[in-house]
Amino acid sequence: IDPKQVVVIQLNALMKNDSPYKDRGIEQTWEFAHPNNQRMTGPLDRFKRMLKGASYSMLIDHKENTVTEIYKSSTMATYEVVVLDKDKQYFKFKWKVEKNNKEGNLLDCWLTTAVSQPIPMGSSI
């Protein structure tokens, strides 16, 4: 999977967080988190609380998103992500993905290593 597609998959999952069941979007986002990121933000229950907390709750059930490439190499990519949340407020994030170089079934997969704190960008109206 292309690195941008990893970001898009995660955002689309969060956009429909409770489909097909409660918190499936967060779980799918977790599955694409780099092992180093999982160590910092996990286990999964803690990750769920983090995403539902004040810093990242605007990602849950957001209305739309755009993903713009900032930097890409053969092992790392950074994207600017803008989301319109369910309250019609825009937020910007820096989303970093890296190619996993650890042995195992995720070897050579692009996985999220970091997501910045959101930057409020104002209302859509």
Regions found by a protein language model. Give the residues of each.
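Detector for Asparagine
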Residues: 12, 17, 36-37, 65, ...
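Residue-level signal for functionally critical sites in structured catalytic/ligand-binding pockets
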Residues: 10, 15, 25, 79-81
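Short solvent-exposed beta->alpha transition segments
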Residues: 20-74
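Exposed beta-sheet edge and beta->alpha loop/turn motif
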Residues: 69-125
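Short, aromatic-enriched amphipathic alpha-helices that serve as compact interaction elements
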Residues: 2-18, 32
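Context-gated lysine
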Residues: 4, 16, 22, 48, ...
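Proline-rich intrinsically disordered, low-complexity coils
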Residues: 3, 20, 35, 118-120
